[in-house]
Amino acid sequence: MEQQHRNQKSMQDQNDEIEDVQHGPFPVEQLQASGIAALDVKKLKDAGLCTVESVVYAPRKELLQIKGISEAKVDKIIEAASKLVPLGFTSASQLHAQRLEIIQITSGSKELDKILEGGIETGSITEIYGEFRCGKTQLCHTLCVTCQLPLDQGGGEGKAMYIDAEGTFRPQRLLQIADRYGLNGPDVLENVAYARAYNTDHQSRLLLEAASMMVETRFALMIVDSATALYRTDFSGRGELSARQMHLAKFLRSLQKLADEFGVAVVITNQVVAQVDGSAVFAGPQIKPIGGNIMAHASTTRLALRKGRAEERICKVVSSPCLAEAEARFQISVEGVTDVKD
């Protein structure tokens, strides 16, 4: 009887393992079972391709640039990866079923969650832009805590990753917000992987490190605050505009790949610039997010924040494939983002 129980438990463990393999991203080591040499797999990992999905998503010319991998090997790798992760057509009903499994991470405000239909969506990029002191970084701090909550409380049951380009990340804010949700402060801090980015190349390299970390453990959220700050200083003038936009496009594409591979919610903050033209004489200068069309096309959902009275802030859904254009009021307090207390 005991032996039968052990066999059943062993079969259950095997089924759980199979289920994990089927639903999670495939580690790139699985290519070895398809005849790819361990040395070549190591070269893929060193190039930042830590999952089979990342190999499939990469253009062929990118794989050819990896030192020590020949053209014949690249073709063999692509063939093996494509069998594990087929990228063909699927029916809209299958896609709809997959979309129903997407998790929304609560923002901390019920009013804000209402216009977001549950919260920040996983598996896509959400851009938050606005002037200074409008709550972008405070919303990011709140999300770092709420993403660790259980699913039934609006969380993502995962860790958070924070790339800080402006030096505005404050761990003590996470402790204050954790108290609001009854979470253990030290555990919350331990579940946030933090990195300070010092230039645009460093910011891009951090994404390679992020991918290898996401293979090892479950992350629910990836924040880049701000995605564009370093581009404003590293590239100057119209002469470097083309190079800046190309570099930014590659960075945003890498972020989208992380969202696709690991199902994380990617949140990027963006700075704004005053748009001074003829109408500004009468209506005052209008603001617009920097990054141009490349930034607009890369973001799945765009949220504009602006200041209200005192600590009140207003969030507007500017563009989204599934959310209606709407506004919500929220408040910045010691507990992070909360509903406005009238």
Curated annotation (Swiss-Prot):
GO terms for biological process: chromosome organization involved in meiotic cell cycle; DNA recombinase assembly; DNA strand invasion; mitotic recombination; mitotic recombination-dependent replication fork processing; reciprocal meiotic recombination. Residues 51-80 form the HhH domain. The keyword Transport does not apply. PANTHER family: DNA REPAIR PROTEIN RAD51 HOMOLOG 1, RECA/RAD51/RADA DNA STRAND-PAIRING FAMILY MEMBER. InterPro entries: AAA+_ATPase, DNA_recomb/repair_Rad51, DNA_recomb/repair_Rad51_C, DNA_recomb/repair_RecA-like, DNA_repair_Rad51/TF_NusA_a-hlx, P-loop_NTPase, RecA_ATP-bd, RecA_monomer-monomer_interface. The lineage of its organism: Eukaryota, Viridiplantae, Streptophyta, Embryophyta, Tracheophyta. It is found in: Nucleus. This is DNA repair protein RAD51 homolog. GO terms for molecular function: ATP binding; ATP hydrolysis activity; ATP-dependent activity, acting on DNA; ATP-dependent DNA damage sensor activity; DNA strand exchange activity; double-stranded DNA binding; single-stranded DNA binding. The keyword DNA-binding applies. Disulfide bonds: none annotated. Binds to single and double-stranded DNA and exhibits DNA-dependent ATPase activity. Underwinds duplex DNA. It comes from the Eukaryota. Pfam families: HHH_5, Rad51. Belongs to the RecA family. RAD51 subfamily. ATP binds at residues 130-137. It comes from Solanum lycopersicum (Tomato).
